[in-house]
Amino acid sequence: MRSRSVTAAVCGLLLVSLPSTAFGEVVRHRDPADDVARAAVGSNVYAPAPDQVRGDIIATKVRFARRAVWIRYRLQDLAPTGNGNFHVIGLRSDRRERTIQLNAFPGHWEGGAVVTNTRAQAVGCLVTHRIDYDRNRIGLRVPRSCLGKATWVRVGIRTTVAGTTYAYVDDARAAGYSASLVYGRRVHREP
């Protein structure tokens, strides 16, 4: 009986002493459902559209591993219909700021990503993405080098779905419409 306790204690100490995995810090956030806002196409006046589910962000996950920031978010409904869906992902770090524009529209529903700096100039950054319409999810991998080898990052996410008469927008961290992107708390890189 005593040998089992000693064995369990030794195993516990060994597990604690092992180096951490390469997953880094993970931050999850649940966005309130039914907080989409709408504006007539060509207008910048937004009003609540609680019945709109397409483009409604409901959960985000940010993981800062050794070599990359992994971003995944889920929507109530994401479909390859209408005039397109457009996503803005902002990244602020202790080194650099980057904005990723991920646009998917008729004929290009797989989407294309462009990364810009604070002066809205395109920068060479090999961001990879995947839009999964069946699971209503979007995932991105941002190499750490794009952020100047940052030690922490804050992420903001906004989705816009364009219809023929209205555009619907949701910010992952704001309840309702916000004129500027709302960023989450710092996510630290794995040492």
Name each region found by the language model.
Residues 69-71, 87, 138, 155:
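Hydrophobic residues positioned within well-ordered beta-strands of beta-sheet architectures
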Residues 72-74, 90, 141-143:
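Residue-level recognition of well-ordered beta-strand positions that form the cores
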